[in-house]
């Protein structure tokens, strides 16, 4: 088999066999296939696409290029949730203890943030003493005992994906549905999930800006999962404004605690209940989505979800008293109110710009090596559709520097107030095939 033949075959719009895809991935990881040939095939895929069988084969080739986490010692159906990323996306922090409280095992591998805000790991590390570097045996033991544990990404998972992603990043082949879908799904499958719930974001703060693109990605990932024996479904949710009210690590953790107490923002609570209901059904803990939703609401109302979060924090070395004493979380030195320049209704909160403003304060990373400030960020006091009076606070800037003129300038272009009301949509579609 020759790489040049595989490139020409895909260039001319033909279907690659599983053997050809395996030959490419194996050779590329070993270093036998040079970058210039790999980038040539990536560009051919970008223009000619792949069918469902090719996408599944590419995904499994990347899974098999490295280690796979063995979660077989964990009792029950392990359901993983993946979000394509957004601004103020606190769902994992709420979902993990919430679905664990209704007996769904959550063995979660999460990453650090790059860009707008921190990842789940950064947010959890805002809790004093919390550690995510735990070995596989401890990880499995914690999930069996308490139904929930979160670890940082480690080991040699999907090395082919890491190598191919770095190549796509510099060769203009990032925005390819088969390449994005196989990249995401290879990581989820290698992490040992039996079933997968996907939260595909769309809008100004999302990777997929249009609903059409988000749908294409959701369908691609759901089909890959189902084709390789992982029960998979996707929800397309809106990221035209940040989710919830908090953007920043300790601020989002506080918001997660409030949500588990039943006092969280409406949009975050609704998205968590929608995703959580799907997870509960996939884990065979309820027969219908309505029944699953009722179980989750009961777990919040009874305090069971909050108790689960406390035990989860304690199990991983963290100070569980932060739940009742949020002032023990990192606090920013200054709180600066950003006020409305006129009266009307909020019609636009550009997620990307608000995320960048939060990053300028120190809440996110530009490179993997950057340190982040866990205390800083932005809290939205108004959301799209809300009425606001001139001089009223639109948002609060939590900063460790007094001069935030650069941040204010960024925010000026991200907020629009008009004399008409806009009603945002939170959940656009549910995709099951």
Swiss-Prot record:
EC number(s): the record gives 2.4.2.2
**Which keywords are on file for this protein?**
Glycosyltransferase, Metal-binding, Potassium, Transferase
Identify the GO cellular component terms for this protein. cytosol
**Cofactor annotation:** K(+)
Single annotated GO MF: deoxyuridine phosphorylase activity
Kindly list the biological process annotations in GO that this record carries: pyrimidine nucleobase metabolic process; pyrimidine nucleoside metabolic process
Q: Which PROSITE patterns match?
A: THYMID_PHOSPHORYLASE (PS00647)
Q: Binding positions for substrate? A: 168, 187
| Statement: the UniProt record of this protein carries the keyword Secreted | no
In which residues is K(+) bound? 88, 90, 243, 246, 255
Q: Which reaction does it catalyse?
A: uridine + phosphate = alpha-D-ribose 1-phosphate + uracil; thymidine + phosphate = 2-deoxy-alpha-D-ribose 1-phosphate + thymine; 2'-deoxyuridine + phosphate = 2-deoxy-alpha-D-ribose 1-phosphate + uracil
Cofactor: record remark: Binds 1 K(+) ion per subunit.
Taken from the UniProt record, the cysteine pairs bridged by disulfide bonds within this chain are none
**UniProt binding sites for phosphate:** 81-83, 92, 108-110, 120
Instruction: Briefly state the protein's biological role.
Output: Catalyzes phosphorolysis of the pyrimidine nucleosides uridine, thymidine and 2'-deoxyuridine with the formation of the corresponding pyrimidine base and ribose-1-phosphate.
Q: Which NCBIfam families match?
A: PRK05820.1, PRK06078.1, Y_phosphoryl
Assembly behavior: Homodimer.
Q: Which family does it belong to?
A: Belongs to the thymidine/pyrimidine-nucleoside phosphorylase family.
Q: List the protein's name.
A: Pyrimidine-nucleoside phosphorylase
